[in-house]
A protein has these predicted regions:
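Symmetry-related core transmembrane helices of the 12-TM Major Facilitator Superfamily/SLC fold
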Residues: 176-191, 215-218, 243-250, 515-532
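Cytoplasmic helix-loop-helix junction between adjacent transmembrane helices
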Residues: 117, 121-150
Length: 545
């Protein structure tokens, strides 16, 4: 019997099922959105709860710790409590903790509520993936996975836009309150559509609690290292060294134990399957570039162009909105084109958008970023759906939950590592370029002296901020100083030197960002290799067989 005959006999998908899928996808979208939307308003949140500096970064870190721990646990806990109960309760708690975050008065409260928000919101991501694979027939998996790709790629891109607008228009608490309206719609949709299944509390007695504890400790320590490492000079800090050792020991022991446990909390054996293992590696590298690029662009605009949160968000929208046009077409492409080829094309296009930013300069702002952002949007939109589909080929329905948790955790982990990597890479490359430029700019060089002289004349005409001994000036400037008094030529030489130094730093900063985009382009090109080694599947339907 042919696949076409199977599809012809397949019963139509009930409306109730589509409502369940839509509600689950809305939840996954909110969970991913809450990573980027908060980062945009972070300086304002820090001011609102009277904190800042290195401590303020814990507002983001806390959410990520909760999320990265619960994602791989979701399959096990949904079996214990049933998908319906587990999803509904966590959705309600996610909304509650969102409100509590908006009401937080100090950093301690905010960290607590953000951990709990991440722990409940993280459930929404893998369960949306599981519901697609378990409730939709194989022929409709591509459509469901296309919807899921919107949550995975569109949400990080549009998050800064929404966060910037809400913060500037209504204040920082609204970056948390925005979850309420769609969250209530999601609750109603899932309450109506998800089937009731029995609980299995007996699984708690047989639970792999040793593995759960090791995984939670290891992932929490690793996430903290990734978020704080650059600020604390990585292994130059005893704090980072200790956390790294804890993460390494806990995760290594966890991995070893999971292979020898009869009922592991995370089924790592799935990674031995060619398509799932290679697909998960590709997903990890995609997450690396996806989240790192979403981090880099607003940073570049803020640091080099002086953009505020709303202005940076408007530029990021160019990366998000085109995806809404492309993603619905991807299931149609998958019917006619090998999924591996689609993923490869998407990765090439995504990498091209990164390489387009190699020519950054001081005038490279919103208009110049339009086409790289649009190209990036197209690449991201093409990649996610076929990658998810072909990675799930050979995964049985009973394994869908375990595969979903592992697959999505690796993308999130890739994003955390990618963001930390580009932060550190930028710091090192900025220092490198600053050193090289300074080595070629000397006060003994005629061009440098001429530039400083021009700047001195400019500051004499327009005024300068600091004071300087007029004896330090030269030629006509010194005579002018003697005639007018030191106050008349306040600080012109120092102002000129500072201006030259600022130009050097600005150029080194821009070159550092360009190098980061080059790094992401190389990572995306490298991601093509595991994709090329995948076996050809039967499309999204392969996940069900």
């Amino acid at each position: 019997m042919t696949g076409g005959d199977d599809r012809a006999r397949e019963a139509p998908v009930p409306l109730k099922t589509w409502i369940a899928v839509g509600g689950a996808l809305l939840g996954a979208f909110l969970a991913v959105l809450n990573i980027q939307i908060t980062n945009t308003a972070l300086p304002y949140i820090e001011g609102g709860i009277a904190t800042g500096g290195v401590y303020g970064t814990w507002i983001s870190t806390a959410y990520l710790i909760g999320e990265i721990i619960v994602v791989p646990l979701t399959d096990y806990l949904s079996q214990v409590f049933s998908v319906r109960r587990y999803l509904l309760v966590n959705t309600a708690l996610f909304l509650l903790f969102s409100v509590m975050c908006g009401q937080a008065h100090n950093l301690s409260e905010m960290i607590l509520y953000r951990v709990l928000q991440g722990f409940t919101g993280g459930v929404l991501i893998p369960l949306a993936f599981t519901i697609i694979l378990s409730m939709l027939p194989p022929s409709k998996h591509a459509i469901g996975l296309a919807g899921f790709s919107i949550t995975a790629t569109f949400a990080p891109a549009i998050g800064p836009t929404i966060g910037g607008y809400l913060n500037d228009a209504y204040g920082w608490p609204w970056v948390f309150y925005v979850n309420l309206a769609p969250g209530v719609v999601m609750l109603a949709a899932l309450w109506y559509s998800l089937p009731k299944t029995p609980t299995r509390f007996g699984l708690l007695r047989r639970g792999d609690w040793r593995g759960i504890a090791l995984m939670a400790i290891g992932l929490a320590a690793l996430q903290t290292v990734l978020d704080d490492g650059n600020v604390d000079d990585w292994f130059g800090s005893p704090y980072i060294v200790k956390l790294s050792l804890i993460a390494a020991v806990a995760l290594v022991v966890f991995i070893v134990l999971e292979f020898f446990t009869g009922e592991p909390v995370v089924n790592l054996r799935l990674l031995a399957r060619r398509n799932f293992g290679l697909g998960t590696l590709g997903n990890f590298l995609l997450g690396f570039a996806l989240y790192a690029s979403a981090f880099l662009l607003p940073q570049y605009l803020a640091v080099t162009q002086g953009f505020d949160a709303e202005q940076a968000g408007e530029v990021m929208a160019w990366t998000g909105l085109p995806q809404l046009l492309v993603i619905p077409l991807v299931p149609l492409f998958m019917k006619r084109i090998d999924a591996r080829l689609l993923v490869g094309v998407g990765l090439v296009v995504f990498s091209l958008s990164c390489f387009m930013n190699l020519w950054l300069d001081i005038d490279y702002a919103a208009p110049q970023l339009l086409w790289p952002d649009v190209v990036r949007a197209v690449g991201q939109a093409i990649v996610m759906t076929p990658l998810s589909a072909i990675a799930m080929v050979g995964i049985a329905p009973a394994e869908a939950g375990a595969a979903s948790g592992l697959f999505n955790m690796m993308r999130n982990l890739g994003g955390a590592i990618g963001t930390a990597a580009v932060e550190t890479f930028f710091t090192k490359r900025e220092q490198f370029h600053s050193f090289i430029i300074n080595a070629h700019v000397s006060l003994l060089q005629p061009a440098t002296r001429e530039r400083i002289a021009d700047l001195q004349q400019y500051f004499l005409t327009h005024g300068a901020a600091s004071t300087v001994n007029p004896q330090l000036l030269s030629g006509n400037l010194q005579q002018y100083a003697m005639a007018q008094g030191a106050a008349g030529v306040a600080g012109v030489w120092h102002e000129a030197v500072i201006a030259v130094g600022n130009t050097i730093r600005a150029q080194a900063t821009i070159m550092g960002y360009a190098d980061c985009f080059a790094l992401l382009g190389v990572v995306l090109v490298a991601a093509i290799l595991p994709i090329a080694l995948l076996r050809k599947g039967t499309g999204a339907g392969g996940a069900a067989h």
